[in-house]
Design a protein with these regions (language model features):
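Glycan-recognition and catalytic cores of secretory/periplasmic carbohydrate-active enzymes
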Residues: 1-189
Length: 189
């Protein structure tokens, strides 16, 4: 929701100055904030289902800009606090030691304990979905811009290093759908 609203309504507001666009942004931020679970420390990505209690996708890092902006516009710090909490949990649980990222981390919605890192759009649970890696890079970069917390800058830089120095990145620097697709040691899930 964040990158959809910010790319459209925020740009419309910047171009026109029409404050009606700001109300859409703030309503969207309120809707996103309603999906926040304090025990988990993140916003819910998808409805709970048989597979996941509380799924959180790396794509959600793109939503945080909406929350940071709404905090500035409304003066309501809860939006900023939710964004920082979500970024902290993503930093802790989505990034692997090599700074590649899981697409989905499933949490216990009561205790906040991470249950499993996996994929829904990548090749396998232990592979790196290239678009998700890009979402993470953008999200951590933007969170650093908003907070000046160097942990986010380090995560963005290391995740970008993983991306641009990956041995499977084609010479045109345009990655395939997944960095590890069809490789030995990666089994589709």
């Amino acid at each position: 929701i964040g990158f959809q609203l910010m790319c459209s309504f925020w740009n419309a507001y910047c171009q026109t100055g029409n404050k009606d666009f700001l109300s859409v942004i703030c309503n969207g931020a309120s809707s996103l904030a309603s999906r926040f679970n304090p025990a988990v420390g993140c916003t819910l990505s998808w409805r709970k289902g048989a597979e996941w209690e509380f799924p959180v996708i790396i794509d959600n890092m793109m939503n945080l800009e909406l929350l940071f902006y709404a905090a500035k516009v409304t003066g309501d710090e809860k939006f900023r606090q939710i964004a920082i909490s979500h970024a902290d949990k993503t930093l802790k649980n989505h990034l692997r030691k090599d700074y590649s990222c899981y697409h989905v981390v499933a949490y216990d919605d009561q205790t906040g304990r991470p249950i499993k890192g996996e994929t829904a759009q990548g090749y396998s649970d232990n592979s790196t979905w290239s678009r998700g890696q890009a979402w993470g890079i953008y999200g951590f970069t933007m969170t650093y811009r908003e907070t000046r917390d160097k942990r986010y800058l380090k995560a963005a830089e290391k995740a970008a290093d993983f991306f641009i120095h990956h041995p499977n990145l084609p010479s045109d620097m345009s990655p395939w759908w997944d960095f590890n697709a069809y490789q030995k040691g990666y089994t589709p899930g």
